[in-house]
From Swiss-Prot:
Gene (name only): algL
Highest taxon in the source lineage: Bacteria
UniProt-recorded name of the protein: Alginate lyase
Species classification: Bacteria, Pseudomonadati, Pseudomonadota, Gammaproteobacteria, Oceanospirillales
Record bears the keyword Signal: yes
Signal sequence segment: 1-26
InterPro entries linked to this entry: Alginate_lyase, Alginate_lyase_dom, Chondroitin_lyas
Pfam families: Alginate_lyase
Name of the top EC class for this enzyme: lyase
Keyword Signal: yes
């Protein structure tokens, strides 16, 4: 530009425009990936629905639960059958709520029966009114249950909130109650898991960040979104040059299983961040891709993990298709190799309550296979 006066006049204007563009993006309402906007498949009527199961009692007690690895050494890799049963028994109402919410939302998005929606909202509203899962009296397993439950519920709820069918339009009072409860619980989850030392930051922190990301979108809270992104960055910066997570390698014979378990929350956070204008794919030189590739290679040849930590790997968990639900968001973030796509197709649909239900319907709807796995 040859005219210096004009250049000086324009400079502040261009700066203002750039600042305005940034502010507009920051102020734009948070949203989930496009698949969450899907309308209800069809609206059925009549008496073919399953009815509403008995509501699990809202859990308002102390979040003090026994760990299924009780008595194990530092590796936390040996299952204690007795304490696992005690854990399952004492947390039964919570997991019933999680599973029931995901199941009913999936059914409603398929069948559109009003009673399916009402059942879900009644459960969530009752737990919200009781201020459930908010106890400040908790141990590590207790605060873990809180963030798992929040992630399950908030990610299922998002499918209702953002659906183009607007199922919550006639249920604004319940929606406000539920969202206020999610919001308060997310604040507690942040408090529970914030700023842990790196040696104690592992898959639990990633799952906590996922629950906060899902809540951020459900309640349009940018502060929660930013915290989830911060925790994501801490997580993927733990991935080494070969795609290993040092803290998960400590899990001895379960190291590969725990590397795989770390992937769903990280892939979901990256996917949700991406749609809101924050590209996390290249963080730590594409660490998420490196981790995913390492796990897929390990599933083919577990000896890679045995060579790394000296322990023969327990492959039991990795025989369950739904443990690979992370492939749905992962293969939209990165270009997956043909053999990975083929593996994904064989295992679809991916339905997992901790990620809000049917991820294939959200990320790869043309390969959804009806009721399989519901």
């Amino acid at each position: 530009m040859r005219n210096p006066k004009l250049k000086n006049l324009l400079a502040p204007t261009l700066l203002s425009l750039a600042m305005f563009a940034g502010a507009t993006q920051a102020a734009a309402p948070l949203r989930p990936p496009q698949g969450y906007f899907a309308p209800v498949d069809k609206f059925k009527t009549g008496d073919k629905s399953d009815g509403c199961d008995a509501m699990p009692a809202p859990y308002t007690g102390p979040l003090q639960f026994r760990s299924k690895y009780e008595g194990s050494d530092k590796a936390r890799a040996t299952l204690n059958v007795q304490s696992e049963k005690a854990f399952r028994d004492t947390t039964k109402d919570i997991t019933t709520l999680e599973r029931g919410t995901a199941k009913r939302v999936m059914q409603f998005m398929r069948d559109g029966r009003p009673e399916q929606l009402e059942c879900t909202l009644n459960w969530l509203t009752a737990w919200a009114k009781a201020d459930a899962l908010m106890s400040k009296d908790f141990n590590h397993t207790g605060k873990s249950m809180r963030k798992w439950a929040l992630g399950s519920m908030a990610s299922s709820y998002i499918r209702l909130k953002f659906s183009d069918s607007h199922p919550l339009a006639q249920h604004q009072q319940e929606a406000q109650l539920i969202e206020a409860w999610f919001s308060k619980m997310a604040d507690q989850v942040v408090s529970d898991w914030d700023n842990l030392p790196l040696e104690k930051t592992n898959n639990h922190s990633y799952w906590a960040a996922w629950s906060v990301m899902a809540t951020a979108v459900a309640t349009n809270r940018r502060d929660l979104f930013d915290w989830a992104v911060k925790e994501y960055k801490v997580g993927v910066n733990q991935v080494d040059a070969d795609g290993f997570l040092p803290n998960e390698l400590k899990r001895q014979q379960r190291a590969l299983a725990y590397h795989n378990y770390a992937l769903p929350p990280l892939a979901m956070i990256a996917s949700f961040a991406q749609i809101n204008g924050v590209d996390l794919r290249q963080e730590n030189n594409g660490a998420l891709k490196r981790l995913g590739d390492r796990v897929l290679a390990g599933v083919k040849d577990p000896d890679e993990f045995e060579e790394k930590n000296g322990k023969k790997q327990d492959m039991t968990d990795l025989k369950e298709d739904m443990k690979f639900a992370w492939l749905e968001p992962f293969c939209t973030l990165y270009t997956c190799a043909p053999d990975v796509i083929e593996k994904k197709r064989d295992m679809q649909p991916f339905k997992t309550f901790r990620l809000g239900g049917d991820l294939t319907k959200v990320y790869d709807p043309s390969h959804e296979k009806g009721n399989k796995g519901s």
